[in-house]
């Protein structure tokens, strides 16, 4: 296993442990090859990508774009990219999603916050 792959596996495992400690039931799926469905499963309606890169900007960009394809493959409504911060606890990492997907999440969680039903995302 390459050094970078081992680093990613450690982060994914630590993230699963953290999410489970918060009451979720998540796990790392077997690698799916060309039909990637994300790094972590078990959060209903979500595809999850996890990045532990030195280049945080690149991790945000590539991971957030990548989770959109994983979302399609999984048939998930939402996608989130968890990005590790160096020398910080897992809980202090970033959870990144596209703004249009965030609006979809808000519509589901807080429908009363929207003025009417005509506020479709572009």
Language-model segments: which ranges?
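Catalytic phosphate/metal-binding cores of nucleic-acid and nucleotide-processing enzymes, i.e., regions
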Residues: 1-122
């Amino acid at each position: 296993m390459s050094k970078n792959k081992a680093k990613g596996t450690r982060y994914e495992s630590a993230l699963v442990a953290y999410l489970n400690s918060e009451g979720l039931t998540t796990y790392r799926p077997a690698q799916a090859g060309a039909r990637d469905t994300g790094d972590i499963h078990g959060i209903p309606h979500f595809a999850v990508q996890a990045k532990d890169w030195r280049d945080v900007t690149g991790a945000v960009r590539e991971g957030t774009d990548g989770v959109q394809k994983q979302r399609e493959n999984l048939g998930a409504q939402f996608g989130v990219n968890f990005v590790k911060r160096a020398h910080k606890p897992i809980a202090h990492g970033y959870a990144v999603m596209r703004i249009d997907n965030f609006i979809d999440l808000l519509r589901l969680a807080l429908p009363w916050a929207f003025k009417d039903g005509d506020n479709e995302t572009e």
